[in-house]
């Protein structure tokens, strides 16, 4: 149980301390080193071949001159450039002066990014902006250009190897090294299109236009002046035309506004007059429509009354006197319904129902009459009594309906209308008419019995 967590994790495949991963890393390192050695050996062989080839050329061997080795030779300027690079690489640049003669280990010889920390020497990894030396800043007194501005520092004589103190060069170097001044110090960025960047004409130089005018003759100058005058006149005319058009547009707008205001006032007056005329016409039309409707209703009522009278006469002539009384009562009901109800649709429906009932009763009365004719001698006295009782019941119903009509205000109105519509008769004439109807009904009854 005393094993650590690392011992547990190194047994995993994904952990870098596992044996399989360590083996893979070692194999990759060995492969890289083998490739490097092989490339070095090939380079050494190539260099040996080149040396032998150069020696044969110096000896004046004709085979080498007539051979195809010139195809594999590098151009003549490449060797010199390679030599210069090797010389510069030999003289490495050091940040500090004490690094030139100081001994360094093998892993730190060629790498300048490694910071040395020698014993007893203060190392500041800082570079001065003015003198471009490492180990101090422009505000330190160690700097040889301390206390001098950029202009004065540029005037100070320096070695050819040292950097220049011109402000533009200093700004460029600052940018390269990662520093930058503020915009208010640099000022406005100048552009090529800026008017301050234009060339200023010297006194000796003349404008090309002036030279062209000097080269012209007097006639040509006169023609030019005429053309210029014409162009100026055309421009003036265009301006005056534009002004006139604007004035005309403004006037037209004012006129349209006035016309619209006048038309609106006239339309309001006409609308008021039309409204008054329409009101008068509507009143007249309503009055005329009312009169027409009243006249039509009167005509319809008269026609209905005439039809009912004809029906009464025909039905009374064919049936008995008791039947005639019942028909009269039903007709009275028809008249009351038509007069009492204002809605025509409802009155018509009720009239249809009553007509159907009356037609059914007529058919029953006709059948009963025929049965009486055939079986008049066979009837028992009890049947006759029952028939009489039925007739008395129908009479009592008719009398009750008449009384209810006389009591109701609608019935009184209907009677008044009938009295107006009928011609005025004396009481003696009315009695004669009643007797005539009774005698007519009795005579018909006697004829039926005789048959």
Swiss-Prot record:
GO cellular component annotations of the record: centrosome; cytoplasm; nuclear speck; nucleus; protein-containing complex
Low complexity bias (residue ranges): 261-296
Residue positions of motif Nuclear localization signal: 233-247, 307-315
Biased composition (Basic and acidic residues): 341-355, 369-387, 413-451
GO molecular function per UniProt: histone deacetylase binding; protein kinase binding; protein-containing complex binding; transcription corepressor activity
Post-translational modification: Phosphorylated by NEK6.
Crosslink (Glycyl lysine isopeptide (Lys-Gly) (interchain with G-Cter in SUMO2)) position: 79, 355
Tagged with keyword Repressor: yes
Sequence ranges of Polar residues compositional bias: 356-367
UniProt superkingdom: Eukaryota
Region (Interaction with RP9): 204-232
Annotated spans, Interaction with RBPJ: 1-121
Basic residues: compositionally biased ranges: 233-260, 305-315
Subunit relationships: Interacts with RP9, SNW1, SFRS1, SFRS2,U2AF1, RBPJ, SAP30, HDAC2 NKAP and NEK6. Interacts with Epstein-Barr virus RPMS1. Component of the histone deacetylase complex. Component of the Notch corepressor complex. Interacts with NKAPL.
Name recorded for this polypeptide: Corepressor interacting with RBPJ 1
Species per Swiss-Prot/TrEMBL record: Rattus norvegicus
Gene name tied to this protein: Cir1
């Amino acid at each position: 149980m005393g094993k650590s967590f690392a011992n547990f994790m190194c047994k995993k495949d994904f952990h870098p301390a596992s044996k399989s991963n360590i083996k893979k890393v070692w194999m990759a390192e060995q492969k890289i080193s083998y490739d490097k050695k092989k490339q070095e050996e090939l380079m050494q062989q190539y260099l040996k071949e080149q040396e032998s080839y150069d020696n044969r050329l110096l000896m004046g061997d004709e085979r080498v001159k007539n051979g195809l080795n010139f195809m594999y030779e590098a151009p003549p300027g490449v060797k010199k450039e390679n030599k210069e690079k090797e010389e510069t690489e030999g003289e490495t640049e050091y940040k500090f002066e004490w690094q030139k003669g100081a001994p360094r280990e093998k892993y730190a010889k060629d790498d300048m990014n490694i910071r040395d920390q020698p014993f007893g020497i203060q190392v500041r990894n800082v570079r001065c902006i003015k003198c471009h030396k490492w180990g101090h800043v422009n505000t330190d007194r160690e700097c040889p250009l301390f206390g001098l501005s950029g202009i004065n520092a540029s005037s100070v004589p320096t070695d050819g190897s040292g950097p220049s103190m011109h402000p533009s060069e200093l700004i460029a170097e600052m940018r390269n090294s990662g520093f930058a001044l503020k915009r208010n110090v640099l000022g406005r960025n100048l552009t090529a299109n800026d008017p301050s960047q234009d060339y200023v004409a010297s006194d000796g130089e003349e404008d090309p236009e002036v030279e062209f005018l000097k080269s012209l003759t007097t006639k040509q100058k006169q023609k030019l002046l005429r053309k210029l005058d014409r162009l100026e006149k055309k421009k003036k005319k265009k301006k005056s035309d534009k002004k006139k058009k604007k004035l005309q547009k403004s006037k037209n707008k004012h006129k349209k506004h006035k016309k619209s205001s006048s038309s609106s006032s006239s339309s309001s007056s006409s609308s008021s007059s039309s409204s008054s005329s329409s009101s008068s016409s509507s009143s007249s039309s309503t009055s005329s429509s009312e009169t027409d409707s009243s006249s039509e209703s009167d005509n319809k009522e008269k026609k209905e009354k005439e039809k009912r009278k004809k029906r009464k006469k025909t039905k009374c002539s064919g049936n008995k006197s008791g039947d005639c009384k019942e028909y009269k009562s039903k007709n009275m009901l028809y008249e009351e319904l038509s007069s009492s109800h204002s809605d025509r649709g409802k009155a018509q429906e009720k009239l249809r129902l009553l007509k159907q009932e009356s037609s059914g009763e007529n058919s029953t009365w006709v059948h009963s009459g025929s049965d009486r004719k055939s079986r008049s001698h066979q009837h028992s006295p009890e049947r006759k009594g029952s028939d009489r009782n039925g007739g008395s019941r129908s009479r009592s119903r008719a009398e009750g309906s008449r009384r209810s009509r006389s009591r109701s205000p609608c019935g009184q109105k209907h009677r008044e209308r009938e009295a107006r519509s009928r011609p005025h008769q004396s009481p003696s004439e009315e009695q004669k008419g009643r007797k005539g109807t009774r005698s007519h009904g009795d005579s018909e009854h006697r004829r039926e019995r005789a048959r």
